């Protein structure tokens, strides 16, 4: 699969440069080592504060802080000082993985793995003759905090919002071990990809 080769080169290079979420590296390596599947853009879950010029203007939005671990209250306070123009939101998002399958049968297996691992928003669709499975959780939180550099909530409420956002992030991440276990079982069933082994050795030296 030419597409898998390109995806693996991109992944291994990003890992080498320290650009991949540390708590999801092992899972991504496992999935990509399986015959007939590979990952594209994926995230281990994140929480942060974002500034959007207007509702829905995601391409022009600006993260004031974005971390893949629980956020400290002091970090939120410091981030809000950078706010300037637009609507300010606190956002917490669960892990999300995009996995491409080589055929419909494999896509169905991946879909079932996502659901059985607790990722209830898992879906799959066909894009440019590729079966793309999106493994996604339900733990999304978006809280408006202010506008145009002005925070419109109390410090007490901000602390509460950060606590809830962190709890939702932890809940989403808590499903990753089960997902890993289920992909390990799939690997034992379908086997390891030789292309993965070769490129891993070539790029990462392991």
Curated annotation (Swiss-Prot):
The question of whether tRNA processing is a record keyword is answered with yes
Fetch the SUPFAM superfamilies from UniProt: SSo0622-like
Origin superkingdom: Archaea
| One Pfam family matching this protein | TYW3
Q: What is its EC number?
A: 2.1.1.282
**Keywords from the named record:** Methyltransferase, S-adenosyl-L-methionine, Transferase, tRNA processing
Q: What class of enzyme is it?
A: transferase
Stretch forming the signal peptide = none
One GO biological process from the UniProt record? tRNA methylation
- Which InterPro entries does this one have? Taw3, tRNA_yW-synthesising, tRNA_yW-synthesising-like_sf
Q: Which Gene3D superfamilies match?
A: tRNA wybutosine-synthesizing-like
**What catalytic activity is recorded?**
4-demethyl-7-[(3S)-3-amino-3-carboxypropyl]wyosine(37) in tRNA(Phe) + S-adenosyl-L-methionine = 7-[(3S)-3-amino-3-carboxypropyl]wyosine(37) in tRNA(Phe) + S-adenosyl-L-homocysteine + H(+)
Any GO molecular function: tRNA methyltransferase activity
Give the UniProt family note: Belongs to the TYW3 family.
Q: What does this protein do?
A: S-adenosyl-L-methionine-dependent methyltransferase that acts as a component of the wyosine derivatives biosynthesis pathway.
This chain belongs to the protein called tRNA(Phe) 7-((3-amino-3-carboxypropyl)-4-demethylwyosine(37)-N(4))-methyltransferase 2
Q: In which organism is this protein found?
A: Pyrococcus abyssi (strain GE5 / Orsay)
Taxonomic placement: Archaea, Methanobacteriati, Methanobacteriota, Thermococci, Thermococcales
């Amino acid at each position: 699969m030419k597409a898998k080769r390109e995806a693996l080169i991109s992944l291994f290079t990003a890992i080498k440069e320290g650009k991949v979420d540390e708590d999801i590296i092992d899972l991504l390596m496992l999935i990509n080592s399986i015959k007939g599947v590979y990952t594209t853009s994926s995230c281990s879950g994140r929480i942060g504060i974002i500034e959007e010029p207007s509702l829905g203007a995601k391409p022009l939005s600006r993260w004031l802080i974005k971390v893949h671990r629980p956020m400290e209250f002091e970090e939120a306070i410091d981030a809000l000082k950078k706010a300037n123009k637009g609507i300010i939101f606190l956002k917490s998002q669960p892990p999300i993985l995009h996995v491409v399958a080589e055929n419909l049968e494999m896509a169905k297996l991946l879909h079932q793995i996502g659901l059985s691992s607790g990722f209830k928003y898992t879906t799959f669709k066909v894009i440019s003759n590729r079966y793309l499975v999106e493994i996604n959780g339900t733990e999304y939180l978006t809280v408006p905090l202010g506008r145009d550099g002005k925070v419109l909530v109390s410090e007490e409420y901000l602390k509460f919002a950060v606590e809830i956002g962190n709890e939702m992030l932890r809940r989403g991440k808590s499903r990753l071990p089960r997902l890993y276990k289920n992909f390990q079982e799939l690997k034992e069933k379908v086997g390891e990809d030789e292309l993965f082994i070769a490129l891993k050795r070539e790029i990462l030296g392991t």
